[in-house]
UniProtKB/Swiss-Prot annotation:
Entry-linked Pfam families: Aminotran_1_2
Top-level EC class: transferase
Cofactor(s) the record lists: pyridoxal 5'-phosphate
Name of the coding gene: hemA
Protein name in UniProt: 5-aminolevulinate synthase
Length: 409
């Protein structure tokens, strides 16, 4: 039997549907973010990254880089084992304490990625609650969906950010059935925010637990970077907060923060935590440095919001189809998978601008887009270059513009 035919067939389907993904070979340069070297088929080229999740540029911050180098030099590279077998090193313990403090919780638990923290965290927590009903927002991330699926618990999906729909499901479940509401605080493809205070109201009214993914908000919102929950004053009302070290903090890893009993139970039962090597000491020290810095420095957050607002204003003024967003995410609607890929290719190859196309299954078919993520280091000149390049690409591909604004805000 020719087993390769099955894989070729699967890949052919992706090509036919115009959603086969090609990775750009990039080399970031510390001190020059958002500039990078693109190792293209035709050789090296200088490009500007407009889609990085290193939202605040902390991956190049001297404190963060310095902490990583110092720790690696002092203690070596790897963790040396799982958490249970020689892998619970001191920088990791310090990082978990820093995260617990960030979110005002008794404890925190680290995982190898934000995907794993959601997948393993939700699955383990829900499994430990007899007859648990999980109420999940329809736009939750794949990692949350997989965690819910692996829990084996009953799941009901409520319409995105629809409080009436959520309340109807809570009411139908009854006061005595255990319930877990799972949602994100900031949805990364549309840039909209969950009404966390009102979700907490419903959870308290109907005796439900809450699990909130703050992956795209930690570091960037709240007076100390605790996320949307901190900004909205509801951290203490949310049972489990989940986040990542790989975006605003510029490092690697995921975590959950909660009361001591929940964290201890997940630590003791979660396969995705127990049976894997711990995060390296240098990564943990770097993440701790990033968190400590952002707890006291507001420059990065303020500059980030300023840059995002300017990008939206300039692109809207140019008549480009900027989708509505209340946050730092700037989605640019295209609505066609092939043209979305073509737009991305033209921006990179002809303008030295890297924006990865966002196609199905990340977003629904017909809602394909370019997802732009400004950083504090995208200056006015780069923003103007972006707008001009996008207009040229839109014209080249025959993509529609909307009516231009009179001026940038």
């Amino acid at each position: 039997m020719d087993y390769s035919q099955f894989f070729n067939s699967a890949l052919d389907r992706l090509h036919t549907e115009r959603r086969y993904r090609v990775f750009a070979d990039l080399e970031r340069m510390a001190g020059r973010f958002p500039h990078a070297i693109w190792h293209s088929p035709k050789g090296k080229r200088d490009v500007v990254i407009w889609c990085s999740n290193d939202y605040l540029g902390m991956g190049q911050h001297p404190k963060v880089v310095g902490a990583m180098v110092e720790t690696a030099t002092r203690v070596g590279t790897g963790a040396g084992g799982t958490r249970n077998i020689a892998g619970t090193h001191h920088p990791l313990v310090q990082l978990e304490a820093e995260l617990a403090d960030l979110h005002g919780k008794e404890a925190a638990l680290l995982f190898t990625s934000g995907y794993v923290s959601n997948q393993t965290g939700i699955a383990t927590i829900a499994k430990l609650i007899p007859n648990c009903l999980i109420l999940s927002d329809e736009l939750n991330h794949n990692s949350m969906i997989e965690g819910i699926r692996q829990s084996g618990c009953e799941r009901q999906v409520f319409r995105h950010n629809d409080l009436a729909d959520l309340e109807a499901l809570l009411k139908a479940a009854g006061a005595n059935r255990p319930k877990l509401i799972a949602c994100e605080s900031l949805y990364s493809m549309d840039g909209d925010v969950a009404p966390l205070a009102k979700i907490c109201d419903l959870a308290e009214k109907y005796n439900a637990m809450t699990y909130v993914d703050e992956v795209h908000a930690v570091g960037m919102y709240g007076p100390r970077g605790g996320g949307i929950a901190e900004r909205d004053g509801v951290m203490h009302r949310i049972d489990i907060l989940e986040g990542t070290l790989a975006k605003a903090f510029g490092c690697l890893g995921g975590y959950i923060a909660a009361n001591g009993q929940i964290i201890d139970a997940v630590r003791s039962y979660a396969p995705g935590f127990i049976f894997t090597t711990a995060l390296p000491p240098a990564i943990c020290s770097a993440a701790t440095a990033a968190i400590k810095h952002l707890k006291t420095s507001s420059w990065e957050r303020e500059r980030h919001q300023d840059r995002a607002a300017r990008v939206k204003a300039i692109l809207n003024a140019a008549g480009l189809p900027v989708m509505s967003s209340d946050t730092h995410i700037v989605p640019l609607f295209i609505g066609d998978a092939e043209k979305c890929k073509q737009a991305s290719d033209l921006l990179l190859e002809e303008h030295g601008i890297y924006i990865q196309p966002i196609n199905y299954p990340t977003v629904a078919k017909g809602s394909e887009r370019l997802r732009i993520t400004p950083s504090p280091y995208h200056d006015d000149g780069l923003i103007d270059q972006l707008a001009e390049a996008l207009l040229q690409v839109w014209d080249r591909l025959g993509l529609p513009l909307k009516q231009k604004s009179l001026a940038a805000e």
